[in-house]
From Swiss-Prot:
The lineage of its organism: Bacteria, Bacillati, Actinomycetota, Actinomycetes, Mycobacteriales. Binds ribosomal protein uS19. The PRC barrel domain binds ribosomal protein uS19. Its main location: cytoplasm. This is Ribosome maturation factor RimM. One of its GO terms (cellular component) is cytosol. It comes from the Bacteria. Keywords: Chaperone, Cytoplasm, Ribosome biogenesis, rRNA processing. It comes from Mycobacterium tuberculosis (strain ATCC 25618 / H37Rv). Pfam families: PRC_RimM, RimM. The keyword Cytoplasm applies. InterPro entries: PRC_barrel-like_sf, PRC_RimM, RimM, RimM_N, RimM_N_sf, Transl_B-barrel_sf.
Length: 176
């Protein structure tokens, strides 16, 4: 499975730098000089699954985004060709998590959600990150519900069984 760690927003200057929107919780590691990333996007002719590999030469912060210089991208035209492309990594390349009750987002997506009594609620489609904490977006038959990812509500997660068990407060699943 591929995970998106950044998106090229636009070129910057005339020397081939690109502005990258960060989509990872560890940009210092993912975008460190010497790191190899795969870029998927409009430059590849739309071929399904194709990607071009780049080595990061330099990186610096720029207003909440990164300015990245890639080996082989030497001018504005080459940088413009990358606009809209996504930098991806393989999920298998992520380090294992040693902390209990801590998960990568992609591990939770697709899990079945049920109540403590075994009643099916739906399927996790996304983990939404907010200033107040994480929410599980759970797709139900006719709608979607956002479940706060806190111990008081999410009582257990079993990656092996593919189940997230919740103890929702009264009304959480009935909100219109």
């Amino acid at each position: 499975m591929e995970l998106v760690v950044g998106r090229v927003v636009k070129s910057h200057g005339v020397t081939g730098e690109v502005v990258v929107e960060i989509r990872t919780d560890d940009p210092a590691d993912r975008f460190a000089p010497g790191t190899r990333l795969r870029a998927k996007g409009p430059f590849d002719g739309g071929a399904e699954g194709s990607a071009v590999s780049y080595v990061i030469e330099s990186v610096r912060q720029h207003g909440g985004r990164l300015l990245v210089r890639l080996a082989g991208v030497a001018d504005r035209d080459a940088a413009d060709a990358l606009r809209g492309s996504l930098f991806v990594i393989d999920a298998d390349d992520l380090p294992p998590i040693d902390e209990p009750d801590t998960y990568y987002d992609h591990q939770l997506v697709g899990l079945m959600v049920q109540t403590a009594t075994g009643e099916g609620v739906g399927v996790v489609t996304e983990v939404v990150h907010t200033a107040a904490g994480e929410l599980l977006a759970v797709k139900r038959d006719s709608d979607e519900v956002l479940v706060p990812f806190v111990r008081a509500i999410v009582t257990s997660v079993s990656l092996d069984d593919g189940i997230v068990e919740i103890d929702p407060p009264h009304g959480l699943l009935n909100l219109e």
